[in-house]
From Swiss-Prot:
GO terms for cellular component: cytosol; glycine cleavage complex. It comes from Vibrio parahaemolyticus serotype O3:K6 (strain RIMD 2210633). The modification N6-(pyridoxal phosphate)lysine is found at K704. This is Glycine dehydrogenase (decarboxylating). The glycine cleavage system is composed of four proteins: P, T, L and H. The keyword DNA repair does not apply. Disulfide bonds: none annotated.
Amino acid sequence: MTELLQSLSTQNEFVGRHNGPKLSDQQKMLEAINAVSLDALISETVPANIRLEQPMTLAEAKSEADMLATMKQFAKQNQVKRTFIGQGYYNTFTPNVILRNVLENPGWYTAYTPYQPEISQGRLESLLNFQQMVIDLTGMEIANASLLDEATAAAEAMTLCKRAGKSKSNVFFVADDVHPQTIEVVKTRAKFIGFEVLVGSLESLPEQDVFGALVQYPSTTGEVRDLTDIIAKAQANKTLVTVATDLLACTLLKPAGEMGADVAIGSAQRFGVPMGYGGPHAAFMATRDKHKRTMPGRVIGVSIDAKGNQALRMAMQTREQHIRREKATSNICTAQALLANMASFYAVYHGAEGLRTIARRTHHMTAILAAGLTKGGFELAHNSFFDTITINTGEKTQDLYTKALAADINLRVLPGKLGISLDETTTVADVEALFAIFGVKEDVTALSTEVAGNEFAAIPEALRRTSEYLTHPVFNTYHSETQMMRYLKQLENKDFSLTHGMIPLGSCTMKLNAAAEMIPITWPEFGSIHPFAPAEQAAGYAALAKDLKEKLCEITGYDAFSLQPNSGASGEYAGLIAIQRYHESRGEGHRNVCLIPSSAHGTNPATASMVSMKVVVVKCDDEGNIDIDDLAAKIEKHKDNLSSIMITYPSTHGVYEEKVKEVCEMVHAAGGQVYLDGANMNAQVGLTSPGFIGSDVSHLNLHKTFCIPHGGGGPGMGPIGVKSHLAPFLPGHIENGVEGEDFAVSAADFGSASILPISWAYIAMMGEAGLSNATKVAILNANYVMERLRPHYPVLYRGKNGRVAHECIIDIRPLKEETGISEEDIAKRLMDYGFHAPTMSFPVAGTLMVEPTESEDLAELNRFCDAMISIREEMTKVKNGEWPLENNPLVNAPHTQVDLSAEEWDRPYSRELGCFPSKATKSWKYWPTVNRVDNVYGDRNLICSCPSIDNYED
């Protein structure tokens, strides 16, 4: 290639689009922080003993067009067939109004978890709708705002049953007609928490001495059975019963709640979310009100704001890992908010009648199929069903299955049987094609007429739903596309996302989610593949996954990867299981002590508790580093039982610890393993790596470092990388291995496979040099912000050369003592300036942790710094008595349009100062839609379902 062609190449175009500051601005920033060059800054920041000796070996960067062309080649290797496998995954139509306005809309997918409710009312409303939808359809009393998948929801239900129940048994019963992938995930959870799992026939449940039970309704083979009597008898034995159910089936079938179930779980996938080779999808959990404080996951509740107006918020957060740590109900952090929102909107758009029509059509097609097969001489395994039938095919099973494959049709193979699951996409032509496979000559139209005479004959009369559902106006209003489009936009406009400005959340890495990275996720070649389709039909996924694993191994210095975990917390869980299985394989299963620094993420101790580890906290010194003397003492005390240490690097204090290699060596010398939490991997890529540092296992947050969007609280992915000695202990899957020996942590082998293309695309378009440069720019941005704010705010931790890593912690505690203004007041006031708050009170109470990422440009960094400096000046006015502590722009923040237009203004500052505090806000303004939300009121008056329409009107 000539020099001119090289200079005109688009090969590295994406790097400049991903990184915020252009080269000239980087130079200005370096001068401002007194650094000679970017590389000099890195040398001052990252300890020399952990710097990589050689660049990463990765392919050269691709242009956006070249990346998409390569991605299309992966996609073409996948074969989209007509799939009737079922087993919890179904074809579905994603309404285009939802596809375009939600899934493909950065206003929805780039938002963060709604910890700041004043700027999150849109998605909070949608998630509340999700909860109401689940409550109504399952017949339960309270629901959460999504879990990772149906299988992990079942595992969470098991632990809920133990916490909430009164039985002294240590055995959990699982009916043998539960989805196989669910059974395996439950077995994994049970083994490491010390429970025994008993798999048996449903009929045997009442006679078992068990603390909890899991049953499937309809069953995995499609059978519909009345569970009322079995549930009552089990409960008489102090057994809490969980029913795994299907939301679409619940529109026609008597729901689990009306049969007396204690817990209902399942997947909302078929409500408009593509199968995606296994995910991501929103699972759900609903239970009785009395169990609400033992229920895992985020719960949206109704509260009021400072003016007494209705406002939504995340309720009962004291149950969660970021507060209760090892005593939390679960380690779940990231859930599936974006997918829950899609399912919620699907229900809003179709409404009760629309959903019932879809269910009737699906059931009618199934009834036609069943009638035709019966007339054709085939015997059904059961005559009651909703959308799934199982045919006794005996010796013909393999021949019929092969014939189906030849006709591009996927069926489910069972011993001596074939399963067929229909869905909303099933057509008359599909039924005719299925008849052809089985040699049935019946006419579909004639069968339809015959079946219509008793439309619900396959549903026992006692199991036909009579109760109403989705009666709230939100499910009965937005049924035209115009109405729906406007409703989606109204909710979107209430929320702050990356489309509005920087989200400087420390330890969250809210970087760019580029449009080019997002495009492939809606391609049918990725979306329409069933996770249990024959492997040859998913060759594209296999090739993509193999290449991504190789890239991640190179980036991390590990030898093997599993893509199965659906979140960072799930990755931690899989990693600790790998460590414990490794110890067991060496006859050292007694090693159960996990050392965790006091600065650790809340998920770390919560996860360690989930694998029955004893958590021992290691102190940090005044500089934010692990206290080496305390570590040595704790290792010595527990050396015989030491399993592992969980560290984060750079530490959650925002510094590169100089002695991290020494920490690893000390733990290894005592027979322990090192788990390096990958939450801060964005400050390692290309400069160092977990494997080089000396770690044995890490999870990576693909929704942080590798650009999968946060989605307002999920999806996420937490694949784990390991050194070779731990590779045999990565999670397996029932589809690939020996039943009972898989230690699966997710329902599908590749977890949330359909979003893997995002991370692959990011790595491909950045290349080695681009990835390394992104890390350097992230460090530059953080140090620039730190240096601009340091004259005004105390910075809590810095490295030995006065530098920070990719984030910095601002200490508000002395300022609060001086002025009376808290970190929460600053966080809320930042909303008036057009910003999402930094991370509050983590890892140190009374602080703000700022992470700008590499994607923010100099103008945005300056806008943020100017806002923070202006807020500091406002704090000084409070201190000096110009404004009273109980009435000033900070404690009254955020300000709304209603405040601006109110007739009375009883405040000692102007409306302009309150609502337009900076020059930037006068040219463009994001408006919070509620005043400060009352958290205490919300938890004391807990309402987790849609409020009356009158409340909206008020």
